[in-house]
């Protein structure tokens, strides 16, 4: 942590854990719930005027933004790095042009994933910045929505391209995947009560020339215009297994022209009917869970406790790619750690070992290094966001919210 400003040491200390407890660099909520009274400032670090030997040396430089009088740039960057780390992204997506709102709204509605308010904000159940109910300790399922691009060539067979995010993991297991295609009926004379029956064939296309294979074939009886789904679980699982992300599909509709049925592909006048692929995938992740109960900061104790704070994605300029929630309660840990509070097991002790080793490398005596107030329990939060390929990703992100704090 050499070279970091003193006021960023608290955030740097906690970033070594890659968890959700960062210094409260940014907060602010449209309608945040009332928070407990602000706790007393933690004791200054050893060696500083009024310093105490009960203070964790490695975290002693931490100061809250209300003490700094302004939003600190180091804390802001620490918050950003932490979010990207939890999403397994190297940097924020480069959003040069937005996905058409009509296409996004249609996809969300068809999946019953949420609704769009009149002001354009997306409301998703359980995506309110709090912990996801029942998410911890279970297999997490990511939901990825990828919109189609096309080669623009007019023919009975149209090739669609999808760039599907694998969420930074090569061992994703595809639970279910499907192509959503809108079939529009044009005026046509039919017998009373008759239906238009067409056969839609979807072919997968490998990277090599001529490597085409049948993915799915489906007979569709049409009475009105509407959406239809075509299963693609196995082809997309094979795509992920090869470490690839680009999915090429040839779509062919027999008898569509004769029966005045028009599959809607990529048409600027039909953005709300743009084809999309939905992938539900899971990644098993066994994590050691710590159930030690911690204190809430209420202004009446200087001991290690959890302090609430709200990170507003608009204030850090990330509301263009994070669709929901508008922010989240990251929370952080602060307070003193007397000797009798030390000894939290699991990740806490591992973290303490890392801190002690850092001081050994600096030639300091680890016997003088006391316990740190750090997260001992973290929870999962659901997020909906764009990735680099303009996929809409709905994901349960682990270790985002600090639930309890302890000493180690």
From Swiss-Prot:
Instruction: Drop me one GO molecular function for this one.
Output: hormone activity
Would you indicate the residue range of the signal peptide? 1-28
Q: Which GO terms describe its cellular component?
A: extracellular space; perinuclear region of cytoplasm
S-S bonds:
297-305, 304-373, 333-405, 337-407
What subcellular locations does the record give? Secreted
Query: Known SUPFAM superfamilies for this protein?
Result: Cystine-knot cytokines
Q: Which family does it belong to?
A: Belongs to the TGF-beta family.
* Described function: Inhibins and activins inhibit and activate, respectively, the secretion of follitropin by the pituitary gland. Inhibins/activins are involved in regulating a number of diverse functions such as hypothalamic and pituitary hormone secretion, gonadal hormone secretion, germ cell development and maturation, erythroid differentiation, insulin secretion, nerve cell survival, embryonic axial development or bone growth, depending on their subunit composition. Inhibins appear to oppose the functions of activins. Activin B is a dimer of alpha and beta-B that plays a role in several essential biological processes including embryonic development, stem cell maintenance and differentiation, haematopoiesis, cell proliferation and wound healing. Signals through type I receptor ACVR1C, abundantly expressed in pancreatic beta cells, and type II receptors like ACVR2A. Upon ligand binding, these receptors phosphorylate intracellular signaling mediators SMAD2 and SMAD3, which form a complex with SMAD4, translocate to the nucleus, and regulate gene expression.
Q: How does it assemble?
A: Dimeric, linked by one or more disulfide bonds. Inhibin B is a dimer of alpha and beta-B. Activin B is a homodimer of beta-B. Activin AB is a dimer of beta-A and beta-B. Interacts with FST and FSTL3.
Name listed for the protein in its UniProt record: Inhibin beta B chain
Q: Which organism is it from?
A: Bos taurus
The gene behind this protein is INHBB
